[in-house]
A protein has these predicted regions:
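Short beta-strand-initiation
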Residues: 196-197, 243
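Active/ligand-binding-proximal structured segments within catalytic/core domains
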Residues: 1-39, 112, 214, 224-236, ...
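Short, compositionally biased low-complexity segments
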Residues: 11, 66, 201-208
């Protein structure tokens, strides 16, 4: 479903992720127990996740179960959203938020996105906040569902040993009467002016490590240089066999040091993440800056580029 945290208002922060949970709580023809039982009977590997821009429901089954799995996934796209289920699941979401805030980097990722994007919707938290989720009502979720879960806003992807003709026939029979309208999304590019004072400190008692997150503008999902950005991030900051890995991780100076390229519709970022002992923070940040300066001035070697291309291509194939 082409909907996520960036499609939410401040008042509805967290509703996309909350709705993802609710889609497994029953439909007009299935109870929550039926949904889980049928997934288990098919021997499926299934799950769901919500991001800034999409909510994904997926299911891997043997070929003989493909139509049954399609029927089930289509059905949960039309949940009942009962008040009783809403009230129960709200407590689950609040516990998830508390757990997220109590583990590394202790809300630092969301805080960094808010600091970078400011009022832009890409700074919205996927989970929402305890305050926004607590205040959310079932009618608000119902209105959001009818607005965002339009047939025109859903994409079905099927791969493997499939019967394409039967899948299309079943979709037309089961989903042909779904409400269909255009869903709007503001994809205006966001760019920020570098600000050395743009820093937020979060203090957490009892921690033994320092978690540092840095964000700067990067290519969007449709920019011509998005692949170059991804390859550069892989060379410089992949979690294995990158410049940061050999300089900071393999030497034992830092516990974790990566650079990621994250592309969205209309905007993008490079996100750097460093985890180290507090007493090493200043020296490691200086070294991090030295490495980025070297990358900027000297570029990359052909061997680094070849390795990164092989790694990225392998990830694309294996991920699918």
């Amino acid at each position: 479903v082409r909907t996520g945290a960036r499609d939410e208002s401040i008042e509805l922060s967290g509703v996309s992720h909350f709705l993802e949970h609710m889609c497994f709580k029953g439909t007009p023809t299935r109870s929550a127990e039926d949904v889980n039982r049928e997934l288990d009977e098919m021997g499926s590997q299934s799950n769901a996740f919500t991001s800034q821009e999409q909510t994904v429901y997926f299911c891997s089954v043997l070929p003989e179960h493909q139509l049954s799995a399609l029927n089930l996934l289509s059905d949960i796209m039309r949940p009942t959203l009962r008040q009783s289920d809403f009230d129960t699941e709200k407590q689950v979401i609040l516990e998830e938020i508390a757990k997220y805030d109590d583990q590394p980097p202790y809300g630092g990722h969301d805080a960094a996105l808010v600091k970078h994007f400011k009022s832009h919707p890409l700074g919205n938290s996927v989970l929402g906040t305890a305050e926004s989720v607590s205040a959310l009502t079932q009618p608000q979720m119902l209105e959001y569902f009818h607005r965002q879960y339009s047939a025109n806003n859903l994409t079905l992807a099927v791969a493997g040993k499939i019967d394409f003709v039967k899948i299309v026939e079943q979709l037309e029979a089961e989903c042909g009467d779904w409400n269909n309208h255009d869903v709007q999304r503001d994809t205006q590019r966001y760019s920020t002016t570098p600000d050395t004072a743009n820093i937020t400190n979060i203090h957490k008692n009892g921690t033994h490590q320092q978690y540092i997150i840095q964000i700067t503008d990067g290519p969007s999902a449709t920019d011509a240089d998005r692949s170059a950005g991804q390859l550069m991030a892989t060379i410089f900051g992949d979690d294995n066999n990158s410049r940061l890995f050999w300089d900071l991780i393999d030497t034992g100076k830092a516990e974790y040091a990566v650079l990621e390229s994250q592309e969205y519709q209309g905007s993008g970022i490079f996100l750097g993440y460093l985890c180290c002992p507090p007493e090493s923070q200043e020296s490691l940040l200086q070294r991090y800056c030295q490495l980025t300066t070297k990358l900027h001035e000297n570029g990359v070697t052909q061997q680094e580029l070849d390795t990164a291309q092989a790694k990225v291509c392998s990830h694309i194939v294996l991920r699918s």
